[in-house]
Design a protein with these regions (language model features):
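Asp-based phosphoryl-transfer active-site loop
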Residues: 70-85, 275
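A metal-dependent, Asp-based hydrolase signature
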Residues: 86, 91-170, 174
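N-terminal low-complexity, Ser/Thr- and acidic-residue-enriched intrinsically disordered segments
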Residues: 27, 76, 84-87, 93
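Non-catalytic pre-domain segments flanking phosphatase-related domains
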Residues: 2-23, 27-76, 98, 102-104, ...
Length: 344
């Protein structure tokens, strides 16, 4: 059958188009997938995360985890952002003391508030945990939940870290944010399980980490319900309701999530029980601890692995030994992270 030149040209165009599509498809298959963890150096820590995700999300894997059970928990201070030289919430509460005393002048003559107002650093250095709890409690007592979150946001927008001279919300660890995003992209719900104040972290968790308020579990003050000027209101009271630290973390997880996580990330003695609870379950489990061993890019403290001791974010040698014995991965900031912060 004779074909006209026009028909032949049309066939040639279709063939060329088909060939182009085929070549593009082949190139796409050959191109490597984007690295989901670009801020991590190649090594055991990065491999542990990738292999865990692969085996728990592959339906053909004997360690497959149904989507409804995919839960990963992250401590915040020292795990997701800088906790030295003092916890961010303590810095916030100290900054709030002047406003608190202005509203309640009698506190100016009471410790521990007097030491803060007068700038008595020697007295502040002797603050006990109870003193700090008083200051933290006073920083939010009497404020509605909504009002307190706005106060936190305003502080976070202006307060700067003494070493880095950047807002605390910029001092989040890029590798850990990538790990959270990677887990979420594979069907995991990521929760922040912090010893810090629940409402404090909820004020910025979504914007900074992509974690909504309902997926933040933290220490809580008592909250009172009342109707103010016809408006139902939840107000913080100056009394502790629950401390979400150490053995409290598994309790908080059970209370809010209602199931054992598949993965848990921490950095200190306060996270020990959360990792024990998480990795004590059946099937594939992942436990990881961040070791701060990079004084040049961040801080170095332990005292695990011979690092300097610290009362903030203590990582004891006994926890390090337990991690090695139970197969938890210890993340070395110095060796495992290509960069620490997004601005590096």
């Amino acid at each position: 059958m004779n074909r006209s030149p026009t028909a032949i040209l049309q066939i040639s165009r279709r063939a060329a188009l088909a060939l182009t599509v085929a070549l593009l498809g082949a190139c796409a298959q050959m191109a490597p997938a984007p690295d989901p963890l670009p801020s991590w150096n190649e090594g055991p820590a990065k491999d542990a995360i990738v292999q865990f995700v692969r085996k728990t999300t592959d339906s053909a894997s004997p360690q497959f985890v149904p989507p409804a059970q995919r839960v990963a928990t992250f401590d915040q201070d020292g795990t997701l952002w800088v906790e030295q030289p003092m916890y961010a919430q303590v810095a916030f509460a100290l900054d709030r003391v002047k406003d608190v005393v202005k509203a309640q002048p009698a506190l100016a003559n009471e410790e521990p508030f007097k030491a803060v107002v007068t700038g008595d650093r020697a007295a502040m250095a002797r603050f006990t945990e109870g003193d700090l709890l008083k200051i933290v409690g006073a920083s939010q007592a009497g404020l509605s939940i909504e009002a307190f979150r706005e106060v936190v946001k305003a502080w976070a927008a202006t307060a700067k870290h003494p070493k880095f001279q950047r807002p605390y919300t910029e001092l989040v660890y890029a590798p850990m944010v990538e790990a959270m995003k990677y887990l979420r992209a594979n069907g995991y719900r990521t929760y922040i399980v912090t010893g810090g104040g629940q409402e404090f972290v909820r004020a910025f968790a979504d914007a900074v980490y992509g974690v909504p308020p309902e997926q933040v579990i933290g220490s809580m003050l008592k909250v009172d319900y009342s109707v103010r000027n016809g408006v139902p209101t939840m107000t913080n009271a100056p009394a502790v309701f629950f401390i979400n630290d150490k053995a409290g973390k598994p309790v908080g997880i059970n209370m809010v999530i209602g199931q054992r996580p598949q993965a848990a990330f921490g950095n200190s003695d306060g996270d020990q029980q959360m990792l024990e609870w998480t990795t004590g379950g059946a099937g594939a489990r992942l436990g990881m601890l961040v070791l701060h061993d990079d004084a040049q890019r961040e801080y170095a403290y332990g005292p695990a692995a011979g690092l300097p001791a610290s009362h903030v974010g203590t990582f004891a040698q006994s926890l390090y030994d337990e991690a090695k014995a139970k197969g938890w991965t210890v993340i070395s900031i110095k060796n495992d992270w290509k960069r620490v912060f997004a601005f590096d």
